[in-house]
Amino acid sequence: MDHIKGSQNQIDWKHFLKSGDRIFIGSNAAVPNALMDQLIDEQASALNDIEVVHILTLGENRWAQKQYQDTFTLNALFLGQGTREAVHEEYADYTPCFLSEIPSLFHDRTLPIDVALISVSPPDPHGYCSLGVSVNVVHAAARSARM
């Protein structure tokens, strides 16, 4: 893929993402923290109004920090330690729903996803990847996303 370069997998974000896009990020132990850190470090000043949709996340959740509120708008479908403060302080949104309802939100475009940032295994000899440790709604998000 020409948009991912070098051994450090530097991503040319302008080919994937633009201001105003809605991204879905993987959940629980499969949060793509390295991708999100790279996006924040390289593009936080160049992008704005990126809606980040996710269910429960583990880790630092830099995108949910107040200093990035002009770049990222968090839309948490479940609340956890890393997102509760942002919602309480009203610089993030909480959309309560049942886990079983989320795939339909993506498929019927009630909540259209532009880009899905997810963790997958390396491809096997046949080119198939596993969604790994946290599949839940990730499959629906990946299939529904523009990219």
Task: Please place each PLM-identified region on the residue numbering.
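Conserved alpha/beta enzyme-core scaffold
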Residues: 1-147
